[in-house]
């Protein structure tokens, strides 16, 4: 009888099969951290003498897309983890494919609806009867906002718009809009002007020469024009003599309706000069008062070359007194007069030193534009 110790234990054919080794290898791979497994460690764990069998398993699994090689002796699992039901994953995949097909069908329906809408819009715009209804004109906008003031504002890009909290004065709220632009001018237009009223008169400040020298309107009955501060500028004559004495009234501030009076001392030394009368701006107003007989209108010179021959001290004295008359109060009355009534001033009120810049006798163009001169 043979010794039991001498008997060799031979494994069965099932234990040596490649299928059983593959199942053990896949289980070991699924349990590895992050699905990464070292082939040398797997061969030692599975007690595989021939590593060729491990390589055969990895080649098959890589071919069907369940694993991928990370390095020469390292692989990573790409399939489902342990405990996952393959049947549930297959059912979920079928549901996702059905949902995707439904979404594609809805997308086709939306594309068809868009084509129909575009064709309908084209049919409406191409119809001749609908041509006049494709836009809004001035009257359509004004009818929608009856009793309100509409202003069209066109400002460059980057304009700052501020609307302060409205102030409640006597039960009425006063709204203000502040616009500020550093890149270009801001244009403001009045939209809802009544078509039955007269056209607005837009006059710059100060008025141009053609408006001042326009022929006066002859009233049917004697009327007295309302004298406004504008008469102070229009009725101030240019000096007609090289040397004159100014009355005491001129040395004071110019009241309303007052004109300059000069005494001629050397009129015999000047030749005869063509003159033209200066029309008062009061004749432009449609007031019912008769002209004031105390208001005098002096002629002005039509030839500027004769004026330039006058002494510089006399011309400077005249313009100095003219600047004293043009104050901020005078400009305020100009803006509030009937001639400037249609204007809506959006800029700050004028001051006393807006247009009084000049050059001394020793200054030149370089001083005007601040151009440095290197000597």
Curated annotation (Swiss-Prot):
One of its GO terms (cellular component) is RNA polymerase II transcription regulator complex. Its main location: nucleus. Pfam families: E2F_CC-MB, E2F_TDP. The keyword tRNA processing does not apply. Keywords: Activator, Cilium biogenesis/degradation, DNA-binding, Nucleus, Transcription, Transcription regulation. Transcription activator that binds DNA cooperatively with DP proteins through the E2 recognition site, 5'-TTTC[CG]CGC-3' found in the promoter region of a number of genes. Component of the EDM complex, a complex specifically required for multiciliate cell differentiation: the EDM complex binds and activate genes required for centriole biogenesis. Activates genes required for centriole assembly (plk4, cep152) and genes specifically required for motile cilia formation (foxj1). Belongs to the E2F/DP family. Component of the drtf1/e2f transcription factor complex. Component of the EDM complex, at least composed of e2f4, e2f5, mcidas and tfdp1. This is Transcription factor E2F4. It comes from Xenopus laevis. The gene is e2f4.
